């Protein structure tokens, strides 16, 4: 079953953010756009390249009013150790959620049960807590934060402009579509 257009479930997890341990719940996402950026494990190979890419785009995400939560089934203590030992991960200013029980990962139907690891997946959640976009890739395929930004801008545009949709490769400032009977067969 697809989770698109479904509300995120309640959760409560510990996270590492800006040198501190914090608690994060679904209430922290209310009224804000959120990205849940799941990855298999700390101290691995593709994961730090992705998390570093998101860190490099974090300022732009913040300007869009987006909170970022990276999530793995590691503990928040492991996240702190990784943050302290990796130059790439040390750039991260967003919350790194620990999910050692896998409850949050399962809430997003994103657990590899046989391994106890999260799949490599991104969920864009609107201010009402509704999932608007999902991207899942195989373990060896890294995600691109530039495309994540494009998808967030498209989701925000569509939310602010009912009746309009963003076509493939849409970028901010480009033409959108207004689906109607007149458009059928003309695109």
Curated annotation (Swiss-Prot):
Q: Pfam families, alphabetically?
A: 1-cysPrx_C, AhpC-TSA
Q: Which Gene3D superfamilies does UniProt cross-reference here?
A: Glutaredoxin
- Biological process according to GO: cell redox homeostasis; hydrogen peroxide catabolic process; response to oxidative stress
Q: Where in the cell is it found?
A: Cytoplasm
Presence of the UniProt keyword Disulfide bond in the record? yes
Q: What keywords tag this UniProt record?
A: Antioxidant, Cytoplasm, Disulfide bond, Oxidoreductase, Peroxidase, Redox-active center
Question: What top-tier enzyme class does this entry carry?
Answer: oxidoreductase
Provide a Gene Ontology MF annotation, just one.
thioredoxin peroxidase activity
Catalyzes what?
a hydroperoxide + NADH + H(+) = an alcohol + NAD(+) + H2O
Q: Name one GO cellular component term.
A: cytosol
Its main localization is: cytoplasm
Boundaries of each Thioredoxin domain copy?
2-157
Where do the catalytic residues lie? 47
Look up the EC number in the record and give it.
Answer: 1.11.1.26
InterPro entries in alphabetical order: AhpC, AhpC/TSA, Peroxiredoxin, Peroxiredoxin_AhpC-typ, Peroxiredoxin_C, Thioredoxin-like_sf, Thioredoxin_domain
Q: How does it assemble?
A: Homodimer; disulfide-linked, upon oxidation. 5 homodimers assemble to form a ring-like decamer.
Q: What does this protein do?
A: Thiol-specific peroxidase that catalyzes the reduction of hydrogen peroxide and organic hydroperoxides to water and alcohols, respectively. Plays a role in cell protection against oxidative stress by detoxifying peroxides.
Family from the record = Belongs to the peroxiredoxin family. AhpC/Prx1 subfamily.
Look up the further comments and give them: The active site is a conserved redox-active cysteine residue, the peroxidatic cysteine (C(P)), which makes the nucleophilic attack on the peroxide substrate. The peroxide oxidizes the C(P)-SH to cysteine sulfenic acid (C(P)-SOH), which then reacts with another cysteine residue, the resolving cysteine (C(R)), to form a disulfide bridge. The disulfide is subsequently reduced by an appropriate electron donor to complete the catalytic cycle. In this typical 2-Cys peroxiredoxin, C(R) is provided by the other dimeric subunit to form an intersubunit disulfide.
What's the protein here called? Alkyl hydroperoxide reductase C
Q: Which organism is it from?
A: Salmonella typhimurium (strain LT2 / SGSC1412 / ATCC 700720)
Lineage of the species this protein comes from: Bacteria, Pseudomonadati, Pseudomonadota, Gammaproteobacteria, Enterobacterales
